[in-house]
């Protein structure tokens, strides 16, 4: 009988320990879960911050490349009227051959310098394209001249890579 009492006491103590252990593991699991959630939160914040930094660097690189690519835009816009004036001067009657030759050389050197910077003349023959041409006058279309074709160029247009610096001013058959 003494043995039975000891066995019962041992069983009760073991049951109490099991209950206490079960109660203790639940808070430990919740603390572990909380710690894991916080770790996941920090990892998520880190990944977002890292992605944001990469986006900032990418945008800065793109902006730097665009600045480099279009650096001569303002200078070209300032030079184009002078180039137009040279063309008008060459069209004047009564100039000596030496003067025409000199003006032609200056014009060629300016055009060459602009081409080196990526500035090109916009083609102003054939069909009218509102992206590159500005219609300043219209003429009636006929059998020889279909609708939306360019009749005459008043002022040449220029572009820098894919940007329009100045559209070509043209007369269009309508």
Swiss-Prot record:
Keyword Repressor: no
GO biological process, alphabetically ordered: protein folding
GO cellular component, one term: cytoplasm
PROSITE patterns in the cross-refs: GRPE (PS01071)
Pfam families, A to Z: GrpE (PF01025)
Signal peptide start and end residues: none
Compositionally biased tracts (Basic and acidic residues): 26-35
Region (Disordered): 1-35
Cell location: Cytoplasm
Chief subcellular location: cytoplasm
Coiled-coil intervals, chain numbering: none
SUPFAM superfamilies: Coiled-coil domain of nucleotide exchange factor GrpE, Head domain of nucleotide exchange factor GrpE
InterPro entries: GrpE, GrpE_coiled_coil, GrpE_head
Similarity remark: Belongs to the GrpE family.
Subunit-level organization: Homodimer.
Record's function text: Participates actively in the response to hyperosmotic and heat shock by preventing the aggregation of stress-denatured proteins, in association with DnaK and GrpE. It is the nucleotide exchange factor for DnaK and may function as a thermosensor. Unfolded proteins bind initially to DnaJ; upon interaction with the DnaJ-bound protein, DnaK hydrolyzes its bound ATP, resulting in the formation of a stable complex. GrpE releases ADP from DnaK; ATP binding to DnaK triggers the release of the substrate protein, thus completing the reaction cycle.
Protein's UniProt name: Protein GrpE
Lineage: Bacteria, Bacillati, Bacillota, Bacilli, Lactobacillales
The gene coding this protein: grpE
